[in-house]
Regions:
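A short glycine-rich, Lys/Arg-flanked "PGG" loop and its adjoining helix->strand segment in the class I
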Residues: 113-127
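Short catalytic micro-motifs in class I SAM-dependent methyltransferases
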Residues: 104-107
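Class I SAM-dependent methyltransferase SAM/SAH-binding core
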Residues: 44-89
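Conserved beta-strand signature within the Rossmann-like core of class I S-adenosyl-L-methionine
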Residues: 127-134
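Short alpha-helix
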Residues: 153-168
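Conserved class I S-adenosyl-L-methionine
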Residues: 1-36, 52-56, 74, 138-140, ...
Length: 189
């Protein structure tokens, strides 16, 4: 997949990749465990791609779901579950969701602190929590984050990653899961 398509998915190749039932499914168990979703939750998936994770959550958990993606092609693929928008300006009301997920998209966000502030804004202040599954710095240049894609992404050490939600006003943040190629960041408003 080309760098351009990974950063703003569009076209046939992107639809086949991000609309696939196995697209990023390696992250699903970790995110679902961290969020501990129940049928009364309201989940927003930021950078939802083709909506495959959202459909899985709807089937397995039965909670309310919504997604947002900056690629119009991905929003069409995820319809009617997703809307077009940017992580730095989420088109949702304050406190609308009890959980926010972001799977393998965070490292593309140009302003991660602003994106996290927006995630915090749309979270219920009492019940809210986030789970962000992102690519670890050790993966840079590997098949998980090949060049030139690796030069466009933001890779964070565990300490740097945990500091970002705290800068965005979250009260707590931690690395909940770590692999050589991935990190799972969890935070509460």
């Amino acid at each position: 997949m080309t760098d351009r398509i990974a950063r703003r998915p569009h076209g046939k190749q992107a639809r086949e990749t991000y609309g696939s039932p196995t697209s990023h499914d390696f992250a699903w168990p970790h995110v679902l465990e961290a969020l501990a979703l129940g049928p009364d939750d309201r989940l927003l998936d930021v950078g939802c791609g083709g909506g495959v994770f959202l459909r899985h959550v709807r089937q397995e958990v039965g909670c309310e779901i919504a997604g947002v993606d900056h690629s119009r092609d991905m929003v069409r693929l995820a319809a009617p579950l997703a809307v077009h928008g940017r992580a730095e300006a989420l088109p949702f009301r304050d406190g609308e969701f009890t959980a926010v997920s972001c799977l393998v998209a965070f490292f593309f966000f140009p302003d991660p602190v602003l994106a996290l502030r927006e995630m915090r804004r749309v979270l219920d202040p009492e019940l809210g929590r986030i789970a962000i599954y992102t690519t670890a710095p050790e993966a840079k240049g590997s098949p998980a984050a090949p060049y030139p894609l690796a030069t466009r992404g933001h890779f964070y050490s565990d300490d740097e990653l945990v500091a970002l939600p705290l800068q965005a006003g979250f009260r707590s943040a931690r690395i909940a899961f770590r692999e050589p190629w991935a990190q799972l960041l969890c935070a509460q408003p």
